[in-house]
Every structure is written in structure tokens, then in C-alpha cells.
Amino acid sequence: MRSSKVIHVVGCHAEGEVGDVIVGGVAPPPGETVWAQSRFVASDNTLRNFVLQEPRGGVFRHVNLLVPPKNKEAVAAWIIMEPEDTPPMSGSNSICVSTVLLDTGIVPMVEPETHMVLEAPGGLIEATAYCKNGKAERIRVKNHPSFADKLDAKLELEGYGTLTVDTAYGGDSFCIVDAHALGFSIKPDEAKDFADLGMKIVKAANQQLGFQHPTNKDWSHISFCQFAAPLTDDNGTPSGANAVAIRPGKIDRSPCGTGCSARMAVLHAKGILKVGDAFVGRSIIGSRFDCRVEAETSIGGRPAIVPSIMGRAFITHTAQLMVDPDDPWQTGYRLSDTWPVWKQD
């Protein structure tokens, strides 16, 4: 067996969304901050392509790289690699990272609760793990400040006419549309249609509405389309199913933590949720995040909320990713039969 590289990975998913974690074999990227390190990963693409492209990966996966924290308050930091983006934050990936840190002993577990400060590329988050018998059973993540950007905005979409949408930020940037108004029910057999239409909506939203984070000049686009079903009552708690289309054209299997945070920010801005209120986010496969509006805050002069999300993650495997020096496809490849071609016109 020959290999010029060995990367150690712990496989994990959070409520259905794959968020594997690199625990060894990769040196920290250059950069004075975790955000700068993530910009290097985003522009270089060598690591992302190696772990996400075939034959080692696929468009359905995310991979997280553990790095030493830059902020002394944090016990660990990580960089999120999605198929197309390297975002400031991810809810499902933060739950995967927290679970791997504790279940593998990288960070000592304290039962019944372990409190951690972690450093995402976009800043610090607080994670509380509810632990029993050596397992982190649930993780509650207090997310970055989240805010509504444009409410009830008009979006022209070819073949559909004028849509009424909301744009918001919940650790990443979203265009939120009414799933039922477009004829969807948030069911697994709609996933391909969600992915295809979602990418058209993302392109149109970037062209017509745009987005600029008030304090992060580098984040100046809308990443995702969230198809949101109308609110229902879940034993007295507002609940909303969703399907989030992720670039280049896949559907989040989890309820999407940043998407739930963005939707809560919109619901708060519209007076539907207040501080202390709970919200249940449900995914296209029926998994759930238990969410809450923790506090009101502001960011860059904008009203915002501090949301939290809670869910489960499960370790699926460990792996050593290798590369044979004679392999003609060492960096991997992608084909449009499974990996959609993304281009923002």
C-alpha cells in the first residue's frame, strides 16, 4: 500500500445531513484568523476537491476541518467545506463537530452537560452537549446574530411570475419562499424539483435583491433558497417544515440550522416570535431541530436575534483518505449526472 497523503476522518451526520470531520493529517491553513484560513481554503480548493469530489466524496457531503482556535475563549475551531461554499457558520455541521469532539475524547466530556465555546469562521458560538453514558445525545448551539434583510420582497422568476419572498441571515444568507404557493408539500419525492427550482431562485435573488452582511464585507451573496411550509402547531409550539436548496443543487437532509435561524429572524421581525419563544424546524426526511429565540441584539446597526438550535448527531464511521502516487485522478473529479453545474449568471 502506497500513499503520499493520509487524512483521518470521523464520519458523522446531524439529523440526516452528512458533516464529516477531519481530525488529523491536514496542517492548519495560513491565516491570522479562522475566517482568513477559511478564505484560503475557499480560494485554493485543493482540500475541498480532495475530500468532497469523487472518488472519495460526493455532492451530498460536507466536510469540516478542525484547526486550533485563534480566540483564547474557544476550545476548538473548524472550517466548513460545503460542495460550493465555505460559509461563516453551519448549524448541522456545528452539531457534528461538537459530537465528534466529545464522543472521540478530543474534548473531555462532562455528564450530564458539557459546555463548550467553539470558533466557527464567522465567530464564536456556544455549544451545550447533553451527555449520558459517554455519548453526546443532543447539542444545543447558540448561533451568531441573525437578522431579516428584506421582508415581503418581490422577485420575478421566469415561468412563475412574481414571487413574494423574504431574505435573511442566520449564519448564512437565504431567500425564503412559500413552498405551498409553489405547489410543494415538503416530501422526499420533491427533492430534485426543489434543488432545480431552488438554484433558479438563488440566481434570481442575487440578481434582483442581493445581500451584503453588515460587518463581513466578504459575504455579499445569497447562498441558499429555503422552501418554507406554513407554520403548524406542535403541542403549542410553532413548527415549520422546510427544504433548503444548497449550491450547486442539492437539498439539506436536516432542518438546516442556519435556515431555521434565518426563518426565526424573519418571524421575529414580523412579530410572530418573541424572545423566549420556541420553534420546531422539520426537514424533508422528517428530522427536527428544537430552536429558540434566546435574545434580541443588533449587528452593524440592524435589529437581530440570538437564536439557538438543538439536534442530534451520530458517528457513522472512521476513514483514512489516501492517494496513490500513480492515481491519474488524485484531486478527484465531478460529473453532472450527480454534481450539478453551478454558475451565477
UniProtKB/Swiss-Prot annotation:
Keywords, comma-separated and alphabetical:
Isomerase, Lyase
State the active site. Answer: S90 (proton acceptor)
Cite a single Pfam family from the UniProt record: Pro_racemase
Keyword Isomerase assigned:
yes
Single GO term (MF): 4-hydroxyproline epimerase activity
Q: What EC number is given for this enzyme?
A: 4.2.1.77
Residues binding substrate, per UniProt: G91, S92, D252, G257, T258
Q: What class of enzyme is it?
A: lyase
Reaction equations catalysed: trans-3-hydroxy-L-proline = 1-pyrroline-2-carboxylate + H2O
Report the Gene3D superfamilies cross-referenced here: Diaminopimelate Epimerase, Chain A, domain 1
For whether the record's keyword set contains Zinc-finger, the answer is no
Taxonomic superkingdom: Bacteria
**Protein function:** Catalyzes the dehydration of trans-3-hydroxy-L-proline (t3LHyp) to Delta(1)-pyrroline-2-carboxylate (Pyr2C). May be involved in a degradation pathway that converts t3LHyp to L-proline, which would allow S.novella to grow on t3LHyp as a sole carbon source.
What does the sequence similarity comment in the record state about its family? Belongs to the proline racemase family.
* NCBIfam families named among the record's database cross-references: T3LHypDht (NF047722)
Name of the protein in its database record: Trans-3-hydroxy-L-proline dehydratase
Name its species.
Ancylobacter novellus (strain ATCC 8093 / DSM 506 / JCM 20403 / CCM 1077 / IAM 12100 / NBRC 12443 / NCIMB 10456)
